[in-house]
Amino acid sequence: IEETDYTKDGSVKSVHKYKLNSEGDVIEETEYDGANKLKEKKEVKYNSLGEKSEEVIYGSDLKVTKKHVFSYNNQGLKTEKKTYDAVNKLISSKKYIYSYQ
């Protein structure tokens, strides 16, 4: 799948290319600028239940810039998102809490 964004004058602003797995989930997203130079690449992994478990983000040099790791509860609700830097050091952790009425 390919998606192109244009500026007001009609020139190409950016191009996003997507690769999907057999379930239709995005497993790779690549973004190029208007000159067709790589800006960013994302690779996504899913667990056995089809939930996004990991997202690795690469810069224009194809070196890892950050990684997100996701956790879920037994109901399939996201419970945590951990973000790591280029050297795999934890830089943030976000917990999700759900309340039911």
Task: Label every model-predicted segment.
Residues 1-101:
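Buried hydrophobic residues that stabilize the cores of well-folded domains
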